[in-house]
Curated annotation (Swiss-Prot):
It catalyses: 4-CDP-2-C-methyl-D-erythritol + ATP = 4-CDP-2-C-methyl-D-erythritol 2-phosphate + ADP + H(+). This is 4-diphosphocytidyl-2-C-methyl-D-erythritol kinase. Pfam families: GHMP_kinases_C, GHMP_kinases_N. It comes from Pseudomonas aeruginosa (strain UCBPP-PA14). Signal peptide: none annotated. Belongs to the GHMP kinase family. IspE subfamily. Its EC number is 2.7.1.148. It comes from the Bacteria. Catalyzes the phosphorylation of the position 2 hydroxy group of 4-diphosphocytidyl-2C-methyl-D-erythritol. One of its GO terms (biological process) is isopentenyl diphosphate biosynthetic process, methylerythritol 4-phosphate pathway. ATP binds at P95, M96, G97, G98, G99, I100, G101, G102, G103, S104, S105. The keyword ATP-binding applies. InterPro entries: GHMP_kinase_C_dom, GHMP_kinase_C_sf, GHMP_kinase_N_dom, IspE, Ribosomal_Su5_D2-typ_SF, Ribsml_uS5_D2-typ_fold_subgr. GO terms for molecular function: 4-(cytidine 5'-diphospho)-2-C-methyl-D-erythritol kinase activity; ATP binding.
Length: 282
């Protein structure tokens, strides 16, 4: 088996996000619909035999030992008892604080890559359980299938939904998830709904009004994109998106936007590009 491996860490969208209530432990009960994008970071792994975990790519403002990639690798080491280590390089394309899963996706890719490189043989459920300790969004990336999520986001039901094209705008802000969920004006009493209701268009993102109020850059991006297509916040933002039936229409709207506004066009996918790549490995 090769001691080197390169794998993608795909972005995700929350196609809706309803907050049903607040639990006694401070976490929020929610419902959301995850779909992956064929766009993301790329990670490169090389196994080492001395047990050291080294991430060679610095992320501004994130200490090495606090990075979810490093925490995922060390967590898997500890839980599995593996004596192997790894060198990791990251090609970072996804924004931090964007609501498209950058850090969680990187952590999930790390767990799956090292399960393969270190020949641990862990099954999907065991990896997802470890991922949940790193963050509520990590299990959806380790499982790799579009899903209707409930609880704090950890109860996942795979779904088969239309794979549309998306134009995603990336306002230059770093949104604090904790700040949004602690806002006193956040809606916390939305009724539970079914996936069919979401696909019929009767849904929203409960975090969007709070994020718009706190982050003018996000509000402006929504106003701009709404001129061309129904726009929505993903997660707690700050990325916003609109859907299109094909790439040509998404590209057409993208070309009409100001040059200074960062954005990308990507296809939605019910099976993540990470898992499609893993299926090709022997």
């Amino acid at each position: 088996m090769s001691v080197r491996l390169s794998l993608p860490a795909p972005a995700k969208l929350n196609l809706f996000l309803h907050i049903l209530g607040r639990r006694d432990d401070g976490y929020h009960e929610l419902q959301t619909l995850f779909q992956f994008l064929d766009h993301g970071d790329e990670l490169h792994f090389e196994a080492r035999q001395d047990g050291q975990v080294r991430l060679h790519t610095e992320i501004a403002g994130v200490p090495h030992d606090s990075n979810l990639i490093v925490r995922a690798a060390r967590g898997l080491q500890e839980a599995s008892g593996s004596l192997q280590g790894v060198d990791i390089w990251l090609d970072k394309r996804l924004p931090m604080g964007g609501g498209i899963g950058g850090g969680s996706s990187d952590a999930a890719t790390t767990l799956l890559a090292l399960n393969h490189l270190w020949q641990l043989g862990w099954d999907e459920d065991r990896i997802a359980a470890l991922g949940l300790r790193l963050g509520a969004d990590v299990p959806v990336f380790t499982r790799g299938r579009a899903a209707f999520a409930e609880g704090v986001g950890e109860k996942l039901t795979p779904v088969d939904i239309p794979e549309l094209w998306y134009l995603v705008l990336v306002p230059q802000v770093l949104v604090s998830t904790a700040e949004i969920f602690s806002d006193p004006l956040l809606t916390r009493d939305s009724p539970a709904i079914k996936v069919r209701t979401v696909l019929e268009g009767d849904s929203r993102n409960d975090c969007q009004p709070v994020v718009e109020r706190r982050y003018p850059e996000v509000r402006n991006a929504l106003i701009l994109l709404n001129k061309f297509v129904s726009a929505r916040l993903t997660g707690t933002g700050g990325c916003v998106f609109g859907s299109f039936p094909n790439k040509a229409e998404a590209d057409k709207v993208s070309a009409l936007l100001p040059d200074h506004l960062q954005r990308f066009v990507a296809k939605g996918s019910n099976v993540s590009m990470l898992h499609r790549k893993l299926e090709t490995l022997v």
